[in-house]
Amino acid sequence: CSGNNALAVGSLCGYTDIKADGTTFLIRSLGERAGCIGSLAALDGSTPSRINIKNSTLDLLLKAPCGSAVGCRKTACDTVISDSDITVHVEGDAVAGIGSAEGKGSLLIKNSDIKSSSSSGIYSLDIGFMNKGCIINNSTINSHLINDPDYHEPSRLMQQN
């Protein structure tokens, strides 16, 4: 999916409750504010969103100035990933592979294999939240993070030239 506000699975604005069991996702999301699975914005007083992924295979790519491959931006989100195989790559100024660079929440990863990579600005992270980390049990995490303070999303560079 692509656009100014691009989200493949979830809610553009507000609460989301996503449950995936035994599911295979292949998602490519590009935009100004983008996500693969989750929510892009909160409503005032909204309930924390929930994402529960189990027994699933995910192959996710996110390219946006801000967003999250799995998670919510600008809103609280509680995420549980179990017995799953996830490959995720993100690029942007304030992006997260799994979790949120701009929101709050909790993240539990158990019995899973996660391969995460990113080329991003200083306000980005591979796995977790800016305000706290996550809990990982009996899982393999392979993370490759290139954090560059001068990173600019490629489309912005093309517009400037």
PLM-predicted stretches and their roles:
Residues 1-30, 37-63, 67-94, 98-119, ...:
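Surface-exposed loop/turn motifs in large extracellular/passenger domains
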